[in-house]
């Protein structure tokens, strides 16, 4: 399974932080969460010690309240695990629309992104 191979490239704190982020996100936003993907250097396996962890979060509908909740979770993860998560947040409609445009950013998410 791809996720297992990916997780082996992450250190123990990073694995714990990602797992906890997913748990808290699902607890706080429940059915609003459509998809969570790891992408960027951590997903490619070419990160360095100072690399952050890029995470795509797709919500059914985004709002300032939902974004605030996500950033509160990220801040708490940083304090507890000393792991910097960098979420990119889209609503489902934005994500689908952007997916139809062949930008480098969206191509990277499509090809290197790993669902968590």
Label the model's feature ranges:
Residues 1-34, 44-49, 59-116:
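Catalytic core of pol beta-like nucleotidyltransferases
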Residues 41:
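P-loop (Walker A) phosphate-binding loop of NTP-binding proteins
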């Amino acid at each position: 399974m791809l996720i297992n191979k990916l997780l082996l490239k992450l250190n123990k704190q990073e694995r714990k932080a990602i797992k906890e982020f997913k748990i808290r996100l699902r607890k706080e936003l429940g059915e609003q969460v459509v998809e969570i993907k790891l992408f960027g250097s951590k997903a490619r396996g070419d990160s360095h010690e100072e690399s952050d962890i890029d995470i795509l979060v797709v919500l059914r509908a985004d709002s300032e309240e939902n974004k605030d909740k996500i950033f509160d979770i990220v801040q708490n993860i940083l304090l507890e695990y000393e792991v910097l998560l960098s979420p990119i947040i889209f609503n489902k409609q934005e994500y689908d629309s952007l997916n139809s445009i062949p930008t480098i950013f969206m191509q990277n998410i499509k090809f290197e992104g790993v669902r968590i």
